[in-house]
């Protein structure tokens, strides 16, 4: 990517969800035995005493809704007109109309991809349905081809079941992915992105649009929010040791789940793409989803 294009990217195509999203989570260091292109990113929610801090993540997710429900072009116009409050209400209404049970997980994955991998959203499932993935993000790498990150997010009663389902989705969906030049027509770009962003995307992603178009590499990102209660025995431990003991329990659970699904995981070797896996445990992921939706309905009122 030429120097002038790198400057355009840094100035005109930033991720909308910034690093404060990550303040709701703690990354857990773990050495899990997967292939070199299968990257496990294991996080837990921040704590409030010896409980997960659902209030903090709930508040931050509300801030993320406009970036999930509205196009970049709409958001830019709102900022220019200083009408972000009105835009947030509109975004909440749009979000509540989405019937997919995975929409909160999709938004969490968008937060990780934008704040952790610095990969802005290109399109969502509601804008383009490409092979059954929930959306795509674009990651601009210095001196490398652009990466297109196809994302899918799920909730599950157990991590083991979630991993099995995610593998099934990848193996069915990846062969069906369509090329970007057939998906990103002029109408889509002009409707959803500013003029500067349209030029950047077309010149980098669509072959033949510019002399320095390199095409892109496919990459995958999976989010699984799953149930893993904080064990009662842990809450009677010393407060200073509690976080590390909790993480040991979570990591052990992940190791056991991945070992249990080892044969299925091995099937992914045929997929020629890096896969980023984001795993986050909840006490009750369905309860968290339901309570967050109810809080949004109150915001709307």
Predicted regions mapped to residue ranges:
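Short acidic, S/G/P-rich loop/turn micro-motifs used as interaction or catalytic elements
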Residues: 156-159, 228-233, 285
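A structured, charge-rich N-terminal accessory region that forms the first stable segment of a protein
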Residues: 2-83
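Extended, charged low-complexity segments
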Residues: 234-301
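Extended, Lys/Arg-enriched charged tracts that mediate electrostatic binding to polyanionic substrates
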Residues: 101-131
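Short amphipathic alpha-helical segments
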Residues: 53, 57, 101-109, 158, ...
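Loop-centered beta-sheet repeat module
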Residues: 120-183
